[in-house]
């Protein structure tokens, strides 16, 4: 396909959190009121954001996906509840879109983070849908952007089966502690691996010949950290399946894995005043959860004495073997406000003043643009594999509402899908 055919591929329809209704507070009884006002008001959060799943629960929408709890006892959310994933069968069983949900990380918000502060933040997180599966809806509707099953909304991925991975470990699916830490479970890696193993055993995933890995923000980071691991796991499982089916020596079957991370390429940067805040927060999170052991294997080998570098893709981008289409803002809001800690925007931003022309903060903002371009270069320049698509908005990730995506057709990327 040409550039025009790629317009929707680089647009992620991200759903902010995985809030769903609890089993003992079914949303079905509220369908009548939803039909009139979607029950979306100030009380929405108290009702587990049920209106988010109106179509799935009440309308029998084709966009509905079923929640599948993992039977692996090691795959646990922060609070110890079972990991899970959403599965929606697509029209073409040979195609699967995997989407890893974002939602930040488990870290101490202080400028000088401590492990105690990180654990405290994890404990607070464990009481929400980003740290527990207890409130996740048994069905969930995905009807926007690249997750939609409607061809007019999603001409590229509409016929793919969808495997949606809700986020409940706070470490971008990297936590790897066999026991508990202050009563918390850091089992992101176990959730990650158990999800793919279970899906290949119990859904049509085992028949897939093409798998696209995507995710936004912390989910996009997870794609960059884990794409090669997932590709190896799927290839190994496929080969084992071929042997069991007697295909040994006859070529067997293969699976093509492609990566499409959105807004997950975060840089190792201090604040605009030179304080090492963001990198220190990530190091504390990784130390508490033993996430270092789950990071990119090639990077860990390259920086054996400095595993903390492998938290940041800029240090290992050229080592990523999976074909990758990188989607990233040149002025990512998360980096502007939480990494650089700027309190202004280059242009009009909701809730933030415009940076003064010629000021230090404005120059830092434009320096971020060049730092991203430099960091992406090793990934982009690899012959025959990846490409990138950058945007100049301050959104942390791309979304599709009622916008016309055809305006996004021109980009600096060659087809990888």
PLM region spans:
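N-terminal signal peptide
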Residues: 14-26, 60-64
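Classical eukaryotic N-terminal signal peptides for Sec-dependent ER targeting/secretion
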Residues: 1-12
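Secreted, short cysteine-rich peptides and small extracellular cysteine-rich domains stabilized by multiple disulfide
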Residues: 23-59
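C-terminal His-loop and adjacent cap/lid subdomain of alpha/beta-hydrolase
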Residues: 60-417
């Amino acid at each position: 396909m040409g550039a025009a055919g790629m317009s929707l591929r680089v647009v992620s329809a991200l759903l902010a959190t995985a809030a769903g209704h609890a089993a003992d507070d079914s949303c079905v009884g509220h369908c009548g009121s939803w039909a009139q006002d979607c029950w979306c008001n100030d009380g929405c959060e108290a009702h587990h954001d049920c209106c988010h799943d109106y179509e799935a629960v009440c309308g029998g929408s084709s966009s509905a996906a079923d929640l599948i709890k993992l039977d692996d006892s090691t795959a646990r959310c922060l609070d110890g509840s079972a990991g899970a994933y959403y599965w929606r069968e697509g029209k073409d069983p040979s195609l699967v879109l995997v989407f890893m949900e974002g939602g930040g990380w488990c870290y101490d918000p202080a400028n000088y983070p401590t492990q105690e502060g990180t654990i405290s933040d994890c404990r607070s997180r464990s009481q929400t849908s980003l740290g527990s599966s207890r409130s996740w809806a048994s069905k969930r509707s995905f009807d926007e952007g690249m997750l939609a099953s409607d061809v007019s909304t999603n001409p590229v991925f509409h016929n793919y089966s969808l495997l949606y991975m809700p986020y409940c470990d706070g470490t971008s699916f990297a936590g790897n502690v066999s026991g508990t830490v202050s009563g918390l479970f850091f089992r992101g890696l176990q959730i990650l691996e158990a999800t793919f193993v279970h899906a290949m055993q119990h859904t049509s995933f085992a028949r897939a010949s093409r798998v696209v890995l995507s995710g936004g923000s912390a989910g996009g980071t997870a794609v960059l950290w884990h794409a090669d691991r997932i590709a190896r796991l799927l290839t190994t499982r496929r080969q084992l399946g071929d042997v069991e089916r007697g295909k040994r020596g006859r070529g067997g079957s293969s699976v093509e894995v492609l990566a499409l991370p959105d807004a997950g390429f975060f840089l190792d940067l201090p604040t605009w005043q030179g304080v090492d805040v963001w990198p220190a927060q990530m190091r504390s999170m990784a130390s508490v959860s033993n996430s270092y052991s789950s990071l990119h294997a090639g990077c860990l080998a390259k920086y054996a004495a400095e595993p903390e570098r492998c938290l940041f893709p800029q240090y290992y981008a050229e080592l990523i073997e999976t074909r990758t289409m990188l989607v990233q803002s040149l002025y990512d809001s998360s980096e502007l406000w939480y990494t650089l800690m700027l309190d202004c925007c280059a242009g009009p931003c909701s809730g933030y003043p415009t940076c003064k022309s010629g000021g230090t903060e404005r120059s830092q903002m434009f320096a971020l643009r060049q730092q991203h371009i430099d960091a992406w270069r090793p990934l982009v320049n690899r012959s025959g594999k990846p490409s990138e698509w950058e945007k100049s908005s301050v959104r942390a990730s791309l979304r599709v509402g009622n916008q016309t995506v055809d305006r996004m057709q021109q980009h600096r990327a060659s087809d990888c899908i």
